[in-house]
Amino acid sequence: MSFVLYLAMTAAELQHHSAPSFPIGFMACHFSPYGTGLSNIPHTLPPGSLLMVNDRTPVNNHDPDLIAAQLCDAAQCLECSGIVLDFQRPGEERTQKIADAVCQLPFPVGITPQYAGKNRCAVFLPPIELAMEPEKYFAPWRDREIWLETVRDSTCIRITKDGNQQLPPMEEGLPYPHTDRELFCRYSIDVQNQHIDFHLCRDEGCLQELMEACTKWGISRFMGLYQQLGPFYSQLLAQDTARFQS
């Protein structure tokens, strides 16, 4: 593969899988509710994995230097290929101080857009919306390294004389006979008297094409949920093995 897909796992999924041989994104590390550092730092990970920190527990009196030191030690001991700061609470000054401290570490760091502006580390972007062209989506970050979250997705866009609206996707199993090479999705069109519905779907095949195309924008790290993309990852490994053997 010309890209790396990390499968994001919870602590329970990692324990159940029993030492996966592929690099993962460990997404169970968070701010301690009882101290000033981090909780749930794993004892072992597959080499080359990403250590992820979320802010589901709000920042209180947490120590940026302590957290940076914990992550530095963990990344070294676990042979991680990088750290992801998956911070979703916007505008937290104390969270920004933690991000600033972690981004000074001698490891690749990816951070969500809310806290990426003041740092020169990679930006960790959410999945591309189905109706958005990738190049336009990446444009605000063209001078930055980008790590991209990927997901199987589907939606419906209804067009009326009054404008557009996004609706839930159509029933699973219905066909998507058309392909859009610009949006990396498949679609169907339902024309009615008062509206036109565009049903969009990004399945595993579209995801693979998207990730391969993203390399031309310098994007080579992708993250997807293990519970959703685990079988897809196995297919990618099988394709690589077949190419190598041939």
Predicted regions and their residues:
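Hydrophobic faces of well-ordered beta-strands that scaffold small-molecule active sites
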Residues: 3-9, 22-27, 47-55, 83-85, ...
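An active-site-proximal structural segment forming one wall of the substrate-binding cleft
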Residues: 62-83, 101
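Glycan-binding loop/region signatures in secreted carbohydrate-active enzymes
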Residues: 147-209, 242
